[in-house]
Amino acid sequence: MSEDAIDLKYAKQVADYLHADHTEVIINKEIVLNALEEVIAMLGTWDITTIRASVGMYLVCKYIHEHTDIRVLLTGEISDELFGYKYTDFAPSAHEFQAESQKRIRELFMYDVLRADRSISVNSLEARVPFGD
């Protein structure tokens, strides 16, 4: 992520609104490449989508573990599946959107929770997943 990434702008706005302490963890190509073997070993999979999605979370969790005394995280995991990703914009009908949403929730355990589970726990952190409760 570059230092001018749009996500940083919005994260700062939210932190300012909540009067929260906010630290930006900038992750560049070199850091990602250096962590890649460790992330693959941690995940126990060669699935490229899982690996790609896990690297950032792993590195942020590692930073939190090494630089703070925080041990419990609140995550937004599962919210994309609940709210339909971008499919909400392109679904052919409300019925098909509902069917796809139900399918994603039924299959969630097969692919989407590995990233957070491993990336967080390997760094001695715990997660609270309100969208998954």
Where does each model-flagged region fall?
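ATP-dependent adenylate-handling active sites, centered on carboxylate activation for C-N bond formation
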Residues: 1-132
